Design a protein with these regions (language model features):
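Conserved alpha-helical scaffold flanking the Walker A/P-loop in AAA+ ATPase domains
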Residues: 15-19, 95-119, 127, 135-138
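AAA+/P-loop NTPase substrate/partner-engagement loops
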Residues: 58-88
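Conserved catalytic/switch belt of AAA+ P-loop NTPases
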Residues: 109, 134-151
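Structural motif
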Residues: 119-121, 150
């Protein structure tokens, strides 16, 4: 069942048993990092729940009157709650607001129209504002008949404990790199590139596919080259000399590229630590193994640990919309200092 979704065998088995059960929980929580396949499996599970001919298997193609895919998420018994467009800021909101939960609550008073049950998926449930979370809690306290609610969350620590106590949690773990690599190759990505992407994506098939598709300034191998060049320059020059004039420090460059660069610095520093410890089989950037071995000899293990903390702080600052140029320059100066101590 759902063979096209790689990994997550136990989660798929649980959901198959759920479909066959006479009594079942009304609310599920799919938790785990972004890109692991939570949304994909939730949509497939929703199809099976909405199919009026299913026998504890996938929804059949004959009666499926909907196509729960991006761009076409319409079905009278299906509700999707996700980040909405903010006209004032001209971008997607980064939270679920109370009006969305109020609208969901109103819909739960309705019985199924054409399916045996009604299904709601709440994406990024961990981003509900406090008022929305409290309103959602009331919905769980008096669960609507004929409904199955599926929460998707990357950080369960941001969910109310009282919400956590009223859902059944399915934890999604990173997928084996070998499985990610096989999936990438099946999508016509060259083996050498697939091997690297499978590892630097850290078991996230969604991230691996996004990295594989990225072009131009967001090409992962081009960005990695820039990140590696910065680390190589540490013994020879002040990092500010390296950063000066770099095109990716320009304000016109998307923050997305800066975030990718910082993530690649994290992975390269992690690999340098693995080389320092002679754990070569744990290297992510396997195609750079010789260069990493050579560079690692110039690093103290304690300095690498500190550098990883500094890079994480830079990433958090960028996510919080702190100035990109200032953040990267501060990070570079701190890393240079600990490297040369």
């Amino acid at each position: 069942m759902w063979e096209h979704i790689i990994g997550h065998t136990e989660q798929k088995k649980f959901l198959q048993n759920y479909l066959q059960a006479k009594e079942r929980p009304h609310a599920l929580l799919f938790s785990g990092a972004a890109g692991l396949g939570k949304r994909t499996l939730a949509l497939e599970f929703a199809k099976a729940l909405l199919c009026f001919q299913h026998n504890g298997t996938d929804g059949c193609e004959a009666c499926r009157l909907m196509n729960l895919q991006d761009g076409n998420l319409s079905h009278p018994d299906f509700v999707l709650v996700q980040h909405e467009w903010d006209d004032k800021k001209d971008r997607l909101r980064d939270t679920i607001i109370i009006d969305q939960i109020r609208e969901l609550t109103a819909k739960t008073a309705l019985a199924p129209v054409m399916s045996p049950t009604r299904v709601c998926i709440v994406e990024d449930a961990d981003t509900m504002v406090p008022a929305a979370a409290n309103a959602f809690l009331k919905l769980l306290e008096e669960p609507p008949a004929g409904w199955v609610i599926i929460l998707l969350a990357a950080n369960v620590n941001r969910l109310l404990p009282t919400i956590m106590s009223r859902v059944v949690q399915l934890r999604f773990q990173a997928i084996e790199p070998q499985l990610v690599e096989q999936e990438l190759q099946a999508r016509q990505i060259e083996p050498a590139k697939a091997a690297v992407l499978a590892r630097i994506s850290e078991g996230s098939i969604g991230l691996a596919l996004n990295l594989a598709a990225a072009k131009g300034q967001l090409d992962v191998f081009e960005c990695r080259k820039q990140a590696a060049t910065f680390l190589e320059a540490l013994p020879l020059a002040m990092p500010m000399n390296y950063l000066a004039g770099r095109s990716w420090l320009d304000k016109k460059v998307q923050r997305e590229q800066a975030l990718l660069l910082v993530q690649l610095w994290q992975l390269l520093l992690r690999d340098l630590m693995m080389c320092n410890l002679q754990l070569y089989d744990r290297i992510y950037n396997i195609d750079l193994l010789d260069e990493l071995k050579s560079q690692s000899s110039g690093w103290q293990l304690s300095a690498l640990k500190q550098a990883l903390v500094i890079v994480q702080e830079a990433y958090d600052a960028l996510v919080s919309s702190v100035g990109m140029k200032t953040t990267l320059e501060t990070m570079a100066l701190k890393i240079d200092k600990i490297y040369k101590e």
